[in-house]
Amino acid sequence: MGRTLYDKIWDEHVVHTEEDGTSILYIDRHLVHEVTSPQAFEGLREAGRKVWRISSIVATADHNTPTTGWELGYDGITDLVSKEQITTLDANIKEFGAAAFFPFLSKRQGIVHVIGPESGATLPGMTVVCGDSHTSTHGAFGALAHGIGTSEVEHVMATQTLLAKKAKNLLIKVEGTLPKGCTAKDIVLAIIGKIGTAGGTGYTIEFAGSAIRALSMEGRMTVCNMAIEGGARAGLVAVDQKTIDYVKGRLLAPTGVEWDQAVQYWATLHSDADAKFDAVVELDASQILPQVTWGTSPEMVLSIEDRVPDPDKEKDANKRGAIERALTYMGLQPGKALNDLYVDKVFIGSCTNSRIEDMREAAAIVKKLGQKVAKNVKLAMVVPGSGLVKEQAEREGLDKIFVAAGFEWREPGCSMCLAMNADRLEPGERCASTSNRNFEGRQGAGGRTHLVSPAMAAAAAVHGHFVDVRKFV
């Protein structure tokens, strides 16, 4: 019987399997950042251990890094805990080593799930882990990638392996052509709206279909990034020529004979025609409209043409209660049109949407509208995902488009995605955000987050409220 892409990568990396199904899985690439690594390095130090395979480690600082004040160097990190975590990472990498380290203030520094692919650290067929739940991003390359906890970070450092049980296979097929103005972000929000945040629990998702194949690698990364919001630890896309073209020539990519051998192997990284999936979900891309989350979970999402739901129309008591709680927190009334929702702040960035295509997408809308950020918007910020993305955007003049319209053009980092740094919402503020989570307090205590695409966020910044971006493309 044929195997799925997930089956193939899993089988290639299993070292041993116990009778209860627990397997020892070999890990090829370990991405490290400043938040979940200090305890792991300290554990190694206390046990007198070294990192088992230094060449597997690629590290950067991202969660705590400020997006302003870089001219002050480390003195620009005003929060003492943030500063300690960043300097501790510097010291730990100096002591234990890494294949590549992109520290704070360096040219290649950025969000770990942006710098991994752009440096060639993420390759097809790899097992990739990181102490961060959005490690699923790297599945866009036909890699088995997922987040791990801090104790597991230490375990991988010490043994280059991980204890895991194999998940079931879920195929999500998106066929057809997206309407103009709709993007990868709209696809994945629509998927989560359909399957819910628990729909992928216990599964590894393979995203497939003509709409997925039509996406660029950056679009595929956006989709895989939010596999975790759909309940799955990992999401994958089969390798094709786009994958190979993206990887070729990257800093850590193989070269010469090794490249030729790798490409030959990568060509096998797709599900066999007779592979069996445990579950299949299908979506029609032509029916996907620009998406906006209205509540406090990514599954609370509707199209821009819809209205805030009425809990009284929900028969299920648990769901009705969840809607009522979300409406209270979000300060919304049932029946309000989503395109009438005014915003206080706009955030374009995060590991979901901070790559060069996202910057171009947002800048194109701003340029097309030819207007300034609306007066009711207190702050509209654009945060590139890495130093290289920032550099490329500036070469293309995208920063000038944003700044001329009243946006703030920031330094790279996780920024307002999670309010672990200086960028955050104040209580009651409403934000159009290109990030991946809209939980209560995610962007700041009492902050209200609406997840959208970069184009939708840019249009909201200029109009002061959500609008249907299809009007402008």
UniProtKB/Swiss-Prot annotation:
NCBIfam families: leuC, PRK05478.1, PRK12466.1. This is 3-isopropylmalate dehydratase large subunit. It catalyses: (2R,3S)-3-isopropylmalate = (2S)-2-isopropylmalate. Catalyzes the isomerization between 2-isopropylmalate and 3-isopropylmalate, via the formation of 2-isopropylmaleate. Pathway: Amino-acid biosynthesis; L-leucine biosynthesis; L-leucine from 3-methyl-2-oxobutanoate: step 2/4. Keywords: 4Fe-4S, Amino-acid biosynthesis, Branched-chain amino acid biosynthesis, Iron, Iron-sulfur, Leucine biosynthesis, Lyase, Metal-binding. Belongs to the aconitase/IPM isomerase family. LeuC type 1 subfamily. The keyword Amino-acid biosynthesis applies. [4Fe-4S] cluster binds at residues 351, 414, 417. Its EC number is 4.2.1.33. InterPro entries: 3-IsopropMal_deHydase_lsu, Acnase/IPM_dHydase_lsu_aba_1/3, Acoase/IPM_deHydtase_lsu_aba, Aconitase_4Fe-4S_BS, Aconitase_4Fe-4S_dom, IPM_dehydratase_rel_enz, IPMI_cat. It comes from the Bacteria. GO terms for molecular function: 3-isopropylmalate dehydratase activity; 4 iron, 4 sulfur cluster binding; metal ion binding. Its cofactor is [4Fe-4S] cluster. Heterodimer of LeuC and LeuD. The lineage of its organism: Bacteria, Pseudomonadati, Pseudomonadota, Betaproteobacteria, Burkholderiales.
